[in-house]
Amino acid sequence: MIKVAFIKFGGMANGGTEKYLQTIAAHLPKDEFEVDFFYCDAAPYIGSDFKHLDTDESRVEYTKSHGVNLIKFDVEFKDVTKPTHDWINTNFFDLFDEDNY
């Protein structure tokens, strides 16, 4: 069994890159892949007034119904003043272990 992790800020939003990643995760053959999808709700940006789409419960249900293991993490802010768009006050690194993949 191949373990794969998808990791996306605002990953259960209904649109854009998020929806494509959800679809890929949902349609990987579950007899070959164990799929984890790490996501957070939208959070305010530092350095921009842009508002990311928030979690859409229909997308949560869609991915769950296709055998995807959802793992929700917290982010207080996304700092877009830095080239790496740092996640501020996140517990992501407490939940994700790269050695599992």
Each language-model region and where it sits:
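N-terminal strand-loop element at the rim of the active site
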Residues: K8-N14, H27-H85
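Short, solvent-exposed coil/turn linker segments
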Residues: P29, N91-F92
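Short N-terminal targeting/anchoring amphipathic segment
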Residues: F93-Y101
